[in-house]
C-alpha cells in the first residue's frame, strides 16, 4: 500500500481566513463594546500595577539581558523599563495576569481576554515612539481599544464551543492566536502576511494545563499569558519579514492541530465574530479569586456578616455546603495540602474559608503568612461541594452566562442559616451599574500603590475622560505611568 502523500499546497483553513478577514475588515460600531473596553483597559492596567507589589512577579520583569538598551522601546507601566516589543509584551502580560484579578471569559473554554493587552499595548507604544521619531503620526488609544475588542472577540468566540481544557491544553493558546492576528494588523501586514502569522500561531506546540492543576499547580500560570502574547508579537514580526505560513495548520491530516492536539475534532462556532465578547466580559472587581468562585466568595462575605450579627464565629461551624456548577468542581474543588499562592487561589474551599474566618479576601490572603493559620485548613475540611445541574445549564446558556454558587452553613449547636444564593457576580454584564463604580475605585487604589498623588491625578484626568483618552497618542499615555 502506498504511503505517498499528495503534495498540493491547499488554501488556508477557513478558520484562519475568518480570523484574518475579521481583524482586517470588521468595523466596530458598538458603543457598549467601546464603553466596556475603556473600563477594561483601566482595570487591566491597574491589575498590573498591583502585581508590582509582589517580588515573585517583579523578578521576571525587565530585559532578557540586563542592561539592554532599545531605542524608542515600549514602556512597561509602573516601571522605568523601555524594551523591545516582544519582551515588553511579556512584561506587561505577566503583570496583568499575576494576581488573577483581570477580566474573565467563561464558556466551554475559560480564559482572560485582557491578557492580550500585553502584546497590543507593547506593539502600539513601540510603533508610536518610532513613528514620532520619524516625524510621523503615532497610534492613538482609540486604536488600542479597537484592538482589545477584536482580540477579546477572537479568543472568546473560539472559546464558546471548544474546550481545549478537555484535551489538556491551556487557554493561553487562544491569547497567542488572538494577539497574533491583532498585532499583525497593527503592524500593517498584508492579508497574506497575517494569514501566515496566524497559521504560525496554530503550528506552535501549545502550553499544557499541567501548571494549573494538582499536584503541579505553580506560578507559570501567572506568566503563561505573558509568554503567549509575547510569542504572538514575535510571530507577527517574523511574518512581516515575509516568513512563510502553513495553510492547513489546523486541518492537515496527521500533522495538523486537529489531529495532533484536538483528538481529530474540528472547531465549532456559536456565532460570527463581532463585539459580543467585550460587551459581555466579566470583571473581577471585589475579590482576586478564580472566577468560578466569585459568587461563592460574595456569598461567604454575606454569611460572615450574618454570623457577626448572630454572635457566631467560624469556630462554631459544623459544616459548609456549596451548591455549584460543573466547571467549578472540575477546576477548583480541591482537597489536601496547598503548597503555594497559585494552589490556594484555585481552591474554592480556601477562597470560602478565608472570608468566613476574617470577612475579607485579598491577594495577600494567598501568601504563606496568612495560609499558615491552622484555622483555614480546619475549616476547609468542613466544606463540601456538589453540582446543581440547573447552575451548570445557566452557566452554558449564552443569554444568561450565570456563574451560580449557593452556600449553606450549619453550626455545632444544630442551627443553620438560610442558603445564600448568588448567581451573577458583581463584574457580570447584568450588574454593570453596580460594578463600574467599584471598578473605578479599584483602579484608583491600584494607582495609589505606585504613584504619588499628583501623578495619580494626571493619569485619572485622562483615563476617566474617554473622549480625551481615545485621542491621546499611545506613547504619551504610557509616559504618564513612568515611575
UniProtKB/Swiss-Prot annotation:
Sequence similarity: Belongs to the PrpD family.
Transmembrane feature ranges: none
Phylogenetic lineage: Bacteria, Pseudomonadati, Pseudomonadota, Gammaproteobacteria, Enterobacterales
Reactions catalysed: (2S,3S)-2-methylcitrate = 2-methyl-cis-aconitate + H2O; citrate = D-threo-isocitrate
GO MF: 2 iron, 2 sulfur cluster binding; 2-methylcitrate dehydratase activity; aconitate hydratase activity
Keywords: Lyase, Tricarboxylic acid cycle
Task of the protein: Involved in the catabolism of short chain fatty acids (SCFA) via the 2-methylcitrate cycle I (propionate degradation route). Catalyzes the dehydration of 2-methylcitrate (2-MC) to yield the cis isomer of 2-methyl-aconitate. It is also able to catalyze the dehydration of citrate at a lower rate, and the hydration of cis-aconitate. It has no aconitase-like activity and is unable to catalyze the hydration of 2-methyl-cis-aconitate.
Protein's name in the database: 2-methylcitrate dehydratase
Pathways per UniProt: Organic acid metabolism; propanoate degradation; Carbohydrate metabolism; tricarboxylic acid cycle; isocitrate from oxaloacetate: step 2/2
Biological processes, Gene Ontology terms: propionate catabolic process, 2-methylcitrate cycle; propionate metabolic process, methylcitrate cycle; tricarboxylic acid cycle
Subunit and interaction comment: Monomer.
Summary of the knockout phenotype: Cells lacking this gene accumulate 2-methylcitrate during growth on propionate.
E.C. number: 4.2.1.79, 4.2.1.3
Pfam families the UniProt entry points to: MmgE_PrpD_C, MmgE_PrpD_N
Amino acid at each position: 500500500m502506498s504511503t505517498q502523500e499528495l503534495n498540493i499546497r491547499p488554501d488556508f483553513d477557513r478558520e484562519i481566513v475568518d480570523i484574518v478577514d475579521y481583524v482586517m475588515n470588521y468595523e466596530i460600531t458598538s458603543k457598549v463594546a467601546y464603553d466596556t473596553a475603556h473600563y477594561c483597559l483601566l482595570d487591566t492596567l491597574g491589575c498590573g500595577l498591583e502585581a508590582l507589589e509582589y517580588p515573585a512577579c517583579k523578578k521576571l520583569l525587565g530585559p532578557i539581558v540586563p542592561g539592554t538598551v532599545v531605542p524608542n522601546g515600549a514602556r512597561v507601566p509602573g516601571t522605568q523599563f523601555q524594551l523591545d516589543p516582544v519582551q515588553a509584551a511579556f512584561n506587561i502580560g505577566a503583570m496583568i495576569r499575576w494576581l488573577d484579578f483581570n477580566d474573565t471569559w467563561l464558556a466551554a473554554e475559560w480564559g482572560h481576554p485582557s491578557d492580550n493587552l500585553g502584546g497590543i499595548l507593547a506593539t502600539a507604544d513601540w510603533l508610536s515612539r518610532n513613528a514620532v521619531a520619524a516625524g510621523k503620526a503615532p497610534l492613538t488609544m482609540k486604536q488600542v481599544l479597537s484592538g482589545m475588542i477584536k482580540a477579546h472577540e477572537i479568543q472568546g468566540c473560539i472559546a464558546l464551543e471548544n474546550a481545549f481544557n478537555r484535551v489538556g491544553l491551556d487557554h493561553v493558546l487562544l491569547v497567542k492566536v488572538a494577539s497574533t492576528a491583532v498585532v499583525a494588523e497593527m503592524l500593517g501586514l498584508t492579508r497574506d502576511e497575517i494569514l501566515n502569522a496566524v497559521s504560525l500561531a496554530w503550528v506552535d506546540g501549545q502550553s499544557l494545563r499541567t501548571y494549573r492543576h494538582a499536584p503541579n499547580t505553580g506560578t507559570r500560570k501567572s506568566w503563561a499569558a505573558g509568554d503567549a502574547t509575547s510569542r504572538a508579537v514575535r510571530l507577527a514580526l517574523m511574518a512581516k519579514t515575509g516568513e512563510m505560513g502553513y495553510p492547513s495548520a489546523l486541518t492537515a491530516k496527521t500533522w495538523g492541530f486537529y489531529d495532533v492536539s484536538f483528538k481529530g475534532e474540528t472547531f465549532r462556532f456559536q456565532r460570527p465574530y463581532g463585539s459580543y465578547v467585550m460587551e459581555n466580559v466579566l470583571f473581577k472587581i471585589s475579590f482576586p479569586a478564580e472566577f468560578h468562585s466569585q459568587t461563592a466568595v460574595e456569598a461567604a462575605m454575606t454569611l460572615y456578616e450574618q454570623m457577626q450579627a448572630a454572635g457566631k464565629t467560624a469556630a462554631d461551624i459544623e459544616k459548609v455546603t456549596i451548591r455549584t456548577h460543573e466547571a467549578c468542581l472540575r477546576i477548583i474543588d480541591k482537597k489536601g495540602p496547598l503548597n503555594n499562592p497559585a494552589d490556594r487561589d484555585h481552591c474554592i474551599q480556601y477562597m470560602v474559608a478565608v472570608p468566613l474566618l476574617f470577612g475579607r479576601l485579598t491577594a495577600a490572603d494567598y501568601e504563606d503568612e496568612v495560609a499558615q493559620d491552622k484555622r483555614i485548613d480546619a475549616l476547609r475540611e468542613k466544606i463540601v461541594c456538589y453540582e446543581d445541574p440547573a447552575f451548570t445549564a445557566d452557566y452554558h446558556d449564552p443569554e444568561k452566562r450565570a456563574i451560580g454558587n449557593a452556600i449553606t452553613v450549619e453550626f455545632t449547636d444544630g442551627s443553620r442559616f438560610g442558603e445564600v444564593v448568588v448567581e451573577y457576580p458583581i463584574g457580570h454584564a447584568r450588574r454593570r451599574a453596580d460594578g463600574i463604580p467599584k471598578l473605578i475605585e479599584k483602579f484608583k487604589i491600584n494607582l495609589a500603590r505606585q504613584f504619588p498623588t499628583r501623578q495619580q491625578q494626571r493619569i485619572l484626568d485622562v483615563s476617566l475622560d474617554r473622549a480625551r483618552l481615545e485621542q491621546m497618542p499611545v506613547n504619551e499615555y504610557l509616559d504618564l505611568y513612568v515611575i
